[in-house]
UniProtKB/Swiss-Prot annotation:
Family, per entry: Belongs to the invasin protein D family.
Coiled coil: 44-77
Compartments, as annotated in UniProt: Secreted
Comp. bias intervals (Polar residues): 26-43
Keyword Secreted among record annotations: yes
Compositional bias (Low complexity): 1-25
Name of the protein this chain belongs to: Invasin IpaD
GO CC aspect terms: extracellular region
Disulfides per UniProt: none
Annotated region described as Disordered, given as residue ranges: 1-43
Keyword terms, alphabetized: Coiled coil, Plasmid, Secreted, Virulence
């Protein structure tokens, strides 16, 4: 992939948002600024090292996502890795931003070579661009790819997993709400009220919790786009505060509550074995739906992680090539 193609793929990627957050490059660490201003090739080396760190952390994140069951500890590790990636992405954007705005003197041989070169050169039919322009294009995109792509999945996975963990706690309590209905072994006693109360609390806690965006609202078109990206059955698009959000699809919990209502009691209900098995089969089916939703979402996050990792790999290779070229042109 040549540099122009790489730049175009970054700036026109479907994962790059229309809205940008410039705050990440406005406040620049003084050490980074000093290093970049004084030693451009050293700063490119620092940039490449930072991209390497991003890939290392990204691999650790992918390992956490590969677990069959996400625990509270897993979520904490995922959040920690995501935070580290964000810091390193921010650092990379700062370095790129300064490189794109700083002028450096070139040596005598390089100046003579450039004087003999055409003012506008083309490669493979593409107009060539300067390294400064390349740094600016990447700096404008790399933060947003993290914030508006990877972190969308992180928030969605975290929110849905938290909901399912609370549901798992209800499942653990369910064993204590079921007992034999008589001495003949032909019936089961179910504490319907206890189960309904627990499921109702879960519903209230999560029916308005957004999967996307984490804060504020977006257009209906944007919400529908991300519902498709996250998995159509995992959420629902709903209006909120003049905009739209993708909320957790609580239909499985609603169905569980409806089936409890159909048992014909709101306290302790005795069911014959056939009726209990029918109820339990429906309950388990809704549980399986939520498990599948979570599994699909985690897999999509893992895929997004791989796409981001490949992008960083290409950027790192490109920057290494640019560093070698710049060594021929710059004074140190």
């Amino acid at each position: 992939m040549n540099i122009t193609t790489l730049t175009n793929s970054i700036s026109t990627s479907s994962f790059s948002p229309n809205n940008t957050n410039g705050s990440s490059t406005e406040t620049v660490n003084s050490d980074i600024k000093t290093t970049t201003s004084s030693h451009p090739v050293s700063s490119l080396t620092m940039l490449n090292d930072t991209l390497h760190n991003i890939r290392t952390t990204n691999q650790a994140l992918k390992k956490e996502l590969s677990q069959k069951t996400l625990t509270k500890t897993s979520l904490e590790e995922i959040a920690l890795h995501s935070s580290q990636i964000s810091m390193d992405v921010n650092k990379s954007a700062q370095l790129l931003n300064i490189l794109s705005k700083t002028e450096y003197p070139i040596n005598k041989d390089a100046r003579e070579l450039l004087h003999s070169a055409p003012k506008e050169a083309e490669l493979d039919g593409y107009e060539m661009i300067s390294h400064r322009e390349l740094w600016a294009k990447i700096a404008n995109s790399i933060n947003d790819i993290n914030e508006q792509y990877l972190k969308v999945y992180e928030h969605a996975v975290s929110s849905y997993t938290q909901m399912y963990q609370e549901f798992s706690a209800v499942l653990s309590s369910l064993a204590g709400w079921i007992s034999p209905g008589g001495n003949d072994g032909n019936s089961v006693k179910l504490q319907v009220k206890s189960l309904k109360d627990a499921l109702t609390t879960l519903k209230k806690n999560y029916e308005d919790k957004p999967l996307y965006p984490a804060t504020n609202t977006v257009s209906e078109q944007e919400a529908n786009k991300w519902l498709t990206e996250l998995g159509g059955t995992i959420g629902t698009v709903s209006a909120k505060n003049g905009g739209y959000v993708v909320s957790i699809n609580m239909t499985p919990i609603y169905n569980m509550l409806n089936r409890l209502d159909n048992l014909g009691g709101n306290g302790e209900v005795v069911l014959d074995n056939a009726k209990y098995q029918a109820w339990n089969a429906g309950f388990s089916a809704e549980d399986e739906t939520m498990k599948n939703n979570l599994q699909t979402l985690v897999q999509k996050y893992s895929n997004a992680n791989s796409i981001f990792d490949n992008l960083v790999k290409v950027l790192s290779s490109t920057i290494s090539s640019c560093t070698d070229t710049d060594k021929l042109f710059l004074h140190f």
